[in-house]
Amino acid sequence: MKLLFPIFASLMLQYQVNTEFIGLRRCLMGLGRCRDHCNVDEKEIQKCKMKKCCVGPKVVKLIKNYLQYGTPNVLNEDVQEMLKPAKNSSAVIQRKHILSVLPQIKSTSFFANTNFVIIPNATPMNSATISTMTPGQITYTATSTKSNTKESRDSATASPPPAPPPPNILPTPSLELEEAEEQ
């Protein structure tokens, strides 16, 4: 659920997508409805051509909770302050502020705190990636280029094979009995 929720929320925050199912117009990725007037408990989020995109209180709460608790490192301080429960504030001012900040939220990446290494003037290489998966253990990944693979093949044929390990002789009950009989 944690992995799907950022995708779900980012889709909800994208521009309006009109879908029609049996003549019923929907907006906000199917979570809102296009109507002339919103009900008392609903909020107007976007415009559906000539109508209003109305969203119920559960969807509004879902979006606010995700923005408040799910993505604190992505949002700037202005948005975080706006999402905190405010007293004596007008819902119209908050809605206008949310709509003005949405393009900024959309432009920020969910991977803003991830470190990426960018190498300028890098030459493309053919590479093979090998990963081993063992349940309950750490996964190790080895990457080798085509030239490294060729060198390792040549060096493997030039070097002698490794010596076999010494045989481990474990005392067995039958051997102990035979030694005892001989004495």
Swiss-Prot record:
Expressed specifically in testis. Residues 141-183 are annotated as: Disordered. The keyword Signal applies. Disulfide bonds join 27-53, 34-48, 38-54. Residues 1-19 form the signal peptide. GO terms for biological process: defense response to bacterium. GO terms for cellular component: extracellular region. Keywords: Antibiotic, Antimicrobial, Defensin, Disulfide bond, Secreted, Signal. Residues 159-170 have a biased composition (Pro residues). It is found in: Secreted. Has antibacterial activity. Belongs to the beta-defensin family. This is Beta-defensin 129. The lineage of its organism: Eukaryota, Metazoa, Chordata, Craniata, Vertebrata. The gene is DEFB129.
